Swiss-Prot record:
Zinc finger (C4-type): 39-60
GO cellular component term of the entry, any: cytosolic large ribosomal subunit
Underlying gene: rpl37a
InterPro entries attached to this UniProt entry: Ribosomal_eL37/eL43, Ribosomal_eL43, Ribosomal_zn-bd
GO biological process, one term: translation
Protein name in the entry: Large ribosomal subunit protein eL43
Compartments reported by the entry: Cytoplasm
Record-listed Zn(2+) binding positions: 39, 42, 57, 60
Keywords carried by this UniProt record: Cytoplasm, Metal-binding, Ribonucleoprotein, Ribosomal protein, Zinc, Zinc-finger
Family under the similarity heading: Belongs to the eukaryotic ribosomal protein eL43 family.
């Protein structure tokens, strides 16, 4: 493995290649894709990325389709909140 420093973090493996601004963009993406997320089924922080858009919970063993780099996409969150709001209006 290549040496990483405090400043560059996970993108230290690229060395001086590709330019600083591109490495900063990739750093943001790689940190979010390697992070563990909270499972929406069991509530534990065990949701990890298996492949592009496929997320697996190590606790309840659920496999969920999500975003490519993050568990929830912004459009999915918007749709979920709209559905929840419509259900609440229907119940009233």
């Amino acid at each position: 493995m290549a040496k990483r420093t405090k400043k560059v973090g996970i993108v230290g493996k690229y060395g001086t290649r590709f330019g600083a601004s591109l490495r900063k963009m990739v750093k943001k993406i790689e940190i979010s894709q390697h992070a563990k997320y909270t499972c929406s089924f069991c509530g534990k922080t065990k949701m990890k990325r298996k492949a592009v858009g496929i997320w697996h919970c190590g606790s309840c063993m659920k496999i969920v389709a999500g975003g490519a780099w993050t568990y929830n996409t912004t459009s999915a969150v918007t749709v979920k909140s709209a559905i929840r709001r419509l259900k609440e209006l229907k119940d009233q």
